[in-house]
A protein has these predicted regions:
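N-terminal Rossmann-like dinucleotide-binding module
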Residues: 1-48
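Short acidic low-complexity segments
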Residues: 52-62
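Beta-strand-loop-alpha-helix segment that lines the small-molecule cofactor/substrate pocket
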Residues: 68-75, 79-126, 141
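Glycine-centered short loops/turns at secondary-structure junctions
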Residues: 89, 116, 141, 224, ...
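C-terminal capping/lid region of NAD(P)-dependent oxidoreductase domains
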Residues: 117, 144, 353-370
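C-terminal glycine/acidic-rich active-site capping loop/insertion
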Residues: 124, 217-222, 245, 250-335, ...
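Rossmann-like NAD(P)H-binding beta-loop-alpha module
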Residues: 129-151, 155-157, 163
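Rossmann-like dinucleotide-binding domain that binds NAD(P)(H)
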Residues: 158-241, 245, 339
Length: 370
């Protein structure tokens, strides 16, 4: 593909954090921005010096200069907006999850296959410095044989936009699914999930879900490994956390219990008091083009008053931008591609189905295993 690659940013709440990263990337250009609220749209356009501004998504898709759309819309719109973009001949990067229905996930996978367009689910966890640290240890053989993986994402969503009250915990599970599958580049074959506890009645009515917590075991395809994940959204006391614990034959990694703590690496065959070591996880900005390395850390931008850029989600944002832009320039699939994104997303959908059936095993759809 030609350089620079023209991106249209769709959704400018969380999405606005990506604009300066694209603007600094040597192979990308923010061609257009889209937001329904015209006042907020113009504010963002003026702040970042972007002239092409749209209040309607259909206007973005009709613009022949747009190469790909970066979708940051509310979760219920992800599948529909992705399919619209693919139908319009646009490549897509979309924030998580891919969809909340297996049917839409399959439609996206099929459409990517038939059109040859690129799709990437913008999963932050697998580009966070913590995941990259564990992945580096694993790839170097320092962890030995992986024996078990576990991940958690407790988060109290009271006070967030109202549509969250309609969500089911495992329908927003890619932050825990992706690291336990992504570390060994595996896919999930089947799941068994239990619901636990109950949320208050108004949440039950809106979401159709009674479970406060959903806890799931995942069997990895063509592997002797299983992984354990759990989620909650309401009515359970716990500080926000997106964690991954990885247990190997030589070394293991455990996530800190609290936000201000340090992660722990355990090394086998040492005297018992010496097995655990508190570690400082390094930054991985060196993997990025120099102009966007600064965005792995939080920075105050003097040109954009009070706007804090970079550093979000473990420094993952510039890595995701670089992956999508590089995939388009190099004409290769981004990671995660459509099939992998569907597998990660459908784990959560299948997990909730399992919970409704008392933990019955539910197999992942065949289209996610290819």
């Amino acid at each position: 593909m030609k350089k620079p690659v023209n991106v249209a940013m769709v959704g400018l709440g969380f999405g606005a954090e990506f604009i300066p990263i694209y603007q600094a990337h040597p192979d990308a250009k923010v061609h257009a921005i889209c937001r329904r609220n015209e006042a907020e749209l113009n504010k963002a356009g003026d702040t970042f010096g972007i002239d092409q501004r749209y209040t309607e998504y259909e206007q973005v898709l009709a613009d022949p200069e747009v190469d790909f759309v970066h979708i940051n819309s509310p979760i219920p719109d992800h599948g529909k907006m992705t399919l619209q973009a693919l139908d319009a001949g646009k490549h897509v990067m979309c924030t998580v999850p891919m969809s909340t229905s297996i049917e839409e996930c399959e439609q996206i996978v099929d459409k990517v296959k038939t059109t040859g367009l690129k799709y990437m689910m913008a999963e932050t966890v697998v580009y966070s410095r913590e995941f990259l640290f564990v992945k580096e240890m694993y790839d170097k053989g320092e962890m030995g044989k992986i024996q078990y993986l576990s991940a958690s994402h407790p988060q109290d969503m009271d006070g967030w936009p109202e549509y969250w009250e309609h969500m089911i915990p495992m329908h927003y599970a890619t932050h825990v699914v992706s690291p336990v599958l992504g570390l060994t580049n595996s896919k999930a074959e089947y799941v068994s999930c239990f619901g636990s506890g109950t949320v208050r009645e108004d949440i039950q009515k809106k979401s159709g879900n009674k479970f406060a917590v959903e806890t799931c075991h995942i069997k990895l395809l063509d592997s002797d490994l299983s992984a354990h994940i759990w989620r909650f959204l309401y009515d359970t006391a716990r500080q926000y956390r997106e964690s991954i614990d990885v247990y190997g034959s030589k070394k293991s990694f455990e996530w800190t219990l609290t936000e201000d703590g340090k992660h722990v690496v355990h090394t086998a065959k040492k005297p018992e008091p010496e097995i655990p070591e508190l570690v400082e996880v390094p930054d991985y900005a060196h993997l990025l083009p120099e102009p966007i390395r600064k965005f792995t850390q939080s920075i105050e931008d003097a040109d954009h008053l009070s706007f804090v850029q970079g550093g979000g989600h473990g420094g993952s944002h510039p890595h995701m931008v670089n992956e999508m832009v590089s995939a388009l320039v190099e004409d290769r699939d981004p990671w995660p591609n459509a099939v992998t994104s569907a597998n990660w997303t459908c784990v959560g959908i299948c997990a909730h189905q399992s919970a409704l059936k008392g933990g019955e095993i539910v197999r992942l759809p065949e289209f996610t295993l290819k």
